[in-house]
């Protein structure tokens, strides 16, 4: 059968407020044994069985008396202890109530003390916040550059009037409130700098900077002297160059008319060189082809030898005529160059440069004719005939 909600609440209340009394339970236990033994004697159900605890013997009766007496004493001491505890609790409660009655007169004083304590705690909290702000500012000052704003009166008090005026003129102290009257003590000036270094460190830095500036000044003066000396030398060189350019401009104006003829002759020389190169390339190509043909037609060489000799004689005559014409052209160009050499030294060099390729071309032409003759009758005849046809 399930318990109701009321029964459950009663059980919980008993468990919460109940207290296990061990001496009382032990005393009830021994009383239960004595009651059971006397009930058995009265009802006549007492047994002489040794296995039962309720056996009526002198020893059991003496043990029951002793146990009952001891447990009674234990229970009595427990009751006395609880009685003393209750009395102490009542005394304490009475004293507490008496004190509460006496505190009613002192309650306003306690409330005023409480309010004062709260006020002091608030002041301590504000002081703590101010210390934190100062610590943050000190950390900022130690880390790098920061700004500091103070009135002019305080600046003059710390630094002096003359130094403050000097710093204001150098724009080191900058005015924060431009609307105030000028040169008044209420003006606020701001400074932005690194305050993490001490006076001794700043003095050493200032001394090292002064020594560096002096060294730089000496180096600049020495370099300035060198630059002035070099400038004089460069000025003289420039004047010499200008004079030389004026002289050359006059010579170029005189030789301007001769340059036109020289350009025309140089064009003719270039055309002659190109023509000779084409002839030489044709001769080389024909020479290679004829060498291949000679290897294929060695067995026919004996039958055609007489006819080729006659043609070779005719070709040699034509080649000699061409060489004579080239030599005549070279002599005429050499005479013209000699005449120009008397007029101007520079034009002489240019014509000399042009004459040299002609001589080289003549030498190369002679070498090619000589090599073509060494290759054999067929090759030389064919190359000579092709060169003659090209010249014509």
Swiss-Prot record:
UniProt biased composition (Polar residues): 331-344, 377-392
What does the UniProt keyword field contain?
A: Nucleus, Phosphoprotein, Transcription, Transcription regulation
Does the record bear Transmembrane in its keywords? no
Q: Answer yes or no on keyword Phosphoprotein.
A: yes
Annotated spans, Disordered: 258-392
Q: Which GO terms describe its biological process?
A: DNA recombination; mRNA export from nucleus; mRNA processing; transcription elongation by RNA polymerase II
Per the record, the major location class is nucleus
Ranges of biased composition (kind: Acidic residues): 258-271, 290-330, 345-367
* A molecular function GO annotation: nucleic acid binding
Phosphoserine modification, residue list: 266
Q: InterPro entries recorded for this chain? A: THOC7/Mft1
Which terms in the GO cellular component ontology are assigned?
A: chromosome, telomeric region; nucleoplasmic THO complex; THO complex; THO complex part of transcription export complex; transcription export complex
More info: Present with 5910 molecules/cell in log phase SD medium.
What does the record give as the function of this protein? Component the THO subcomplex of the TREX complex, which operates in coupling transcription elongation to mRNA export. The THO complex is recruited to transcribed genes and moves along the gene with the elongating polymerase during transcription. THO is important for stabilizing nascent RNA in the RNA polymerase II elongation complex by preventing formation of DNA:RNA hybrids behind the elongating polymerase.
Subunit info here reads: Component of the THO complex, which is composed of HPR1, MFT1, THO2 and THP2. Together with SUB2, TEX1 and YRA1, THO forms the transcription/export (TREX) complex. THO associates with DNA and RNA in vitro.
Give the protein name, as stated in the record.
THO complex subunit MFT1
Please name the taxonomic classification of the source: Eukaryota, Fungi, Dikarya, Ascomycota, Saccharomycotina
């Amino acid at each position: 059968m399930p318990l109701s909600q009321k029964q459950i609440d009663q059980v919980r209340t008993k468990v919460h407020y109940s207290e296990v009394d061990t001496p009382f339970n032990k005393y009830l236990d021994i009383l239960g044994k004595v009651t059971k033994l006397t009930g058995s004697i009265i009802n006549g159900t007492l047994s002489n069985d040794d296995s039962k605890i309720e056996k009526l013997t002198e020893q059991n009766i003496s043990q029951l008396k002793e146990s009952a007496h001891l447990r009674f004493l234990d229970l009595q001491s427990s009751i006395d202890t609880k009685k003393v505890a209750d009395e102490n609790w009542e005394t304490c409660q009475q004293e507490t109530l008496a004190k509460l009655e006496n505190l009613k007169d002192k309650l306003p004083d306690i409330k005023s003390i409480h309010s004062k304590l709260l006020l002091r705690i608030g002041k301590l909290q504000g002081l703590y916040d101010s210390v934190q702000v100062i610590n943050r500012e000190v950390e900022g000052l130690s880390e790098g550059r920061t700004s500091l704003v103070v009135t002019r009166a305080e600046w003059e008090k710390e630094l002096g009037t003359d130094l403050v005026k000097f710093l204001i003129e150098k724009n080191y102290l900058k005015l924060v409130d431009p609307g105030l009257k000028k040169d008044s003590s209420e003006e606020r000036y701001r400074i932005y700098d690194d305050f993490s270094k001490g006076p001794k460190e700043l003095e050493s830095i200032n001394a090292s900077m002064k020594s560096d500036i002096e060294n730089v000044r000496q180096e600049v003066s020495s370099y300035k002297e060198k630059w002035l000396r070099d400038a004089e030398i460069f000025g003289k060189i420039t004047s010499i160059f200008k004079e030389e350019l004026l002289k050359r401009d006059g010579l170029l104006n005189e030789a301007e008319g001769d340059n036109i003829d020289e350009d025309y002759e140089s064009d003719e020389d270039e055309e002659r060189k190109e023509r000779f190169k084409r002839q030489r390339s044709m001769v080389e190509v024909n020479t290679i082809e004829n060498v291949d043909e000679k290897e294929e037609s060695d067995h026919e060489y004996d039958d055609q030898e007489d006819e080729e000799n006659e043609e070779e004689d005719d070709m040699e005559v034509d080649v000699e005529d061409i060489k004579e014409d080239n030599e005549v052209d070279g002599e005429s160009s050499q005479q013209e160059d000699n005449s120009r050499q008397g007029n101007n030294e520079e034009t002489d060099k240019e014509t000399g440069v042009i004459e040299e390729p002609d001589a080289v071309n003549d030498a190369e032409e002679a070498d090619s004719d000589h090599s073509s003759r060494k290759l054999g009758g067929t090759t030389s005849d064919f190359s000579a005939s092709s060169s003659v046809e090209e010249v014509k």
